Amino acid sequence: MLNFISKPVVCLKGEITVPGDKSISHRSIIFGAIAIGTSVIDGFLDGEDCIATLKAFQSMGVRIEGPDKQRVIIHGVGKYGLKQPQNIIDCGNSGTSMRLLAGLLAAQQFDSQLTGDESLLKRPMLRISRPLSQMGADVTTQDGKPPILIKGGKKLNGIHYVMPEASAQVKSCLLLAGMYAEGQTKITENAVSRDHTERMLRTFSYPVQIQDGVIVIDRNGECHGTRLNIPGDISSAAFFIVAASITPGSDILIRNVGINPTRTGIIHILTEMGADIKVLNQRAYGEEPVADLHIRYSQLKGIDIPVSMVPLAIDEFPVIFIAAACAQGKTTLHGAKELRLKESDRIGAMVDGLNQLGVHAEGFDDGILIEGGSIQGGEVNSRGDHRIAMSFAIAGAVASAPVTIKNCANVATSFPSFVTTANILHFQIEEYS
């Protein structure tokens, strides 16, 4: 078992980049694989989750070179060129891989099966299997959870699906199926979710219409190979944004971070809490906005986090809770029940961990209350969740004594270089088994 010890620091200084965006990396493989021609992807995240997606397409006959120095070259086979995988597709810890692949595979002529690790096998899949079945797909789950069995050769028909809650994975799953369906597939969103798939469709020259929260796609299009530069992942940058905000005397710069407006909840929430975050040198990598982030220490205050921020910061809440633990006053969050359905029950994991470190935190069914103060040293269990592990590693920097975090191996799913990157900024994090 891999564990971390994170020791208190004086302050954080320096300049870093973070690995390529995980959401965009997954999608670059998917669309590159079904494109006509070759795609060259730079900035690819070679974490275990994205490698699971890459290997899935290799098993379906797609030639993919790399990753080599974050570059991947994909020799696309076109929309109808995938071959039946010889084995069950193992998505590892990656819900994104499973849900997006399910949409694509539901439209193929061959049968397939998707499985994953112990954590993924507990995650809800009816949210994709039901609308796919409405389209005519034959998708079977095990009591609503993986593994997923998909019978190929089914004729799909477009549907108008009103999203019951914000979910980029469900939306993307249905858009991928809609690329093969008879007629139009329309998806109506009542709350904003990540729009990387829609941007990626444009990058690969596939026609998609977006107006007033309605996305429309049909099968009358092809993806075409392209060159793509992937920005740094704001979900990975979030750990250091919070760290610099709560560690007195800190002053750091994070270069080349994706600032897609469906992902910047972390910046809005921390700014509302009083953080000193400057967004510099704004530009674009293709369809995706990018900037450099300059963060300096500032005393934070507790806030009631608006429900509208939940889908814009869903993956960043564990480390936002660390910021709340260091803020003056109370921070509350509601409307975030989805956090209980992630790689772990993130509300439960954070409440337990914060209480272990002397911070008063209470969990609700859909959120949390945290009374800010000071973080003590101690030992917490990440429950095998990469974001919980990294969040408590950040807490160690400002704790009164070292924080030991157990069960950290899954950090490799999203941020394999986390410890190395952190220590550039003068963290004191050690790994041990």
Curated annotation (Swiss-Prot):
Phosphoenolpyruvate binds at K22, G95, R123, Q169, R346, R387. It catalyses: 3-phosphoshikimate + phosphoenolpyruvate = 5-O-(1-carboxyvinyl)-3-phosphoshikimate + phosphate. One of its GO terms (molecular function) is 3-phosphoshikimate 1-carboxyvinyltransferase activity. Its main location: cytoplasm. It comes from the Bacteria. 3-phosphoshikimate binds at K22, S23, R27, S167, Q169, D315, K342. GO terms for biological process: amino acid biosynthetic process; aromatic amino acid family biosynthetic process; chorismate biosynthetic process. Keywords: Amino-acid biosynthesis, Aromatic amino acid biosynthesis, Cytoplasm, Transferase. Pathway: Metabolic intermediate biosynthesis; chorismate biosynthesis; chorismate from D-erythrose 4-phosphate and phosphoenolpyruvate: step 6/7. It is an enzyme of class 2 (transferase). It is found in: Cytoplasm. Its EC number is 2.5.1.19. SUPFAM superfamilies: EPT/RTPC-like. The active site is at D315 (proton acceptor). Coiled coil: none annotated. Disulfide bonds: none annotated. InterPro entries: Enolpyruvate_Tfrase_dom, Enolpyruvate_Tfrase_sf, EPSP_synthase, EPSP_synthase_CS, RNA3'P_cycl/enolpyr_Trfase_a/b. One of its GO terms (cellular component) is cytoplasm. Monomer. Catalyzes the transfer of the enolpyruvyl moiety of phosphoenolpyruvate (PEP) to the 5-hydroxyl of shikimate-3-phosphate (S3P) to produce enolpyruvyl shikimate-3-phosphate and inorganic phosphate. HAMAP family: EPSP_synth (MF_00210). Belongs to the EPSP synthase family. This is 3-phosphoshikimate 1-carboxyvinyltransferase. It comes from Legionella pneumophila (strain Corby). The lineage of its organism: Bacteria, Pseudomonadati, Pseudomonadota, Gammaproteobacteria, Legionellales.
